[in-house]
């Protein structure tokens, strides 16, 4: 039974994530399944522990917010990451990113992205080691027992089982003096990237399934169109412009739109109603800022993927954006002060005419 609007939102977002999650679990096999289960279970367990220690009712677990935070974090992790990445990241997301601010609806930053950035800074090797797709049941794919060993015993991936993402490969090869066109010609194909046959984080492989889930949320009016559309258009426009100016260094707009976690971030992460602006104009400003930061960090930053950094930086500006874009109260000026009598009378007459 859905108990509140919060429960309803969390349920529908989880349902929208199911297609891309199921595809990622199939594509990367048993280690990815264990990672996803561990991350979600750890997030819920940490939420329960925090509620108990703070003397809050445990029924708040039923709102699904902890499960969703763990789920989103899992989708942004390398699919064969060790167990302690899953557990530690979930504990950080819930304990620091959520409960430290007062619980659901009070957090300033997106908990999943805060945890991902913390993991990336603390454990850069584990967070940038990517397994190649080995679908369940295919030759060479680890069975359930081998998957347990990979997840819980750890160990470096063999060269034949690991590879760089398209964004990471571009960044590395550019430092060696190769042009972007040469690099992407043999390492990036648009259709496989869109359909979901390329490596990367657990939940970012199939742009098609992410898009379908996001469109469903838009149809239900659970998310607003301004953030995903504004963010994607900004990244695409800046990337296309940069590619026209200097094609030797910059990939094109379609490459940036279908690579990494941009689509997942635009539809499922940046649209978090708690950490995004409340007004339409504010959401557009937020989206453009996120998109611009994604492109800038991808192009000149130390990390090839930039969605988490961009979202967190713009989360910090949300209070300012809300203040600047706050609708003017009736009978008051833009600063919130009462209008003088003449202006007030004119405003009333204009309303009466309507």
From Swiss-Prot:
Keyword RNA-binding (UniProt): no
EC identifiers of the protein: 7.-.-.-
S-S bridge residues: none
Superkingdom of this protein's organism: Bacteria
Cofactor(s) demanded: FMN
Topology of this chain in the membrane: Multi-pass membrane protein
Modification sites for FMN phosphoryl threonine: 165
Transmembrane segments: 9-28, 67-87, 117-137, 200-220, 222-242, 249-269, 277-297, 301-321
InterPro entries per record: NqrB/RnfD (IPR004338), RnfD_bac (IPR011303)
GO BP annotation list: electron transport chain; transmembrane transport
Any one of the GO CC terms: plasma membrane
Keywords from the named record: Cell inner membrane, Cell membrane, Electron transport, Flavoprotein, FMN, Membrane, Phosphoprotein, Translocase, Transmembrane, Transmembrane helix, Transport
Localization in the cell: Cell inner membrane
Role this protein plays: Part of a membrane-bound complex that couples electron transfer with translocation of ions across the membrane.
Stated family: Belongs to the NqrB/RnfD family.
Subunit structure: The complex is composed of six subunits: RnfA, RnfB, RnfC, RnfD, RnfE and RnfG.
Protein name listed in UniProt: Ion-translocating oxidoreductase complex subunit D
Origin species: Stutzerimonas stutzeri (Pseudomonas stutzeri)
Originating gene: rnfD
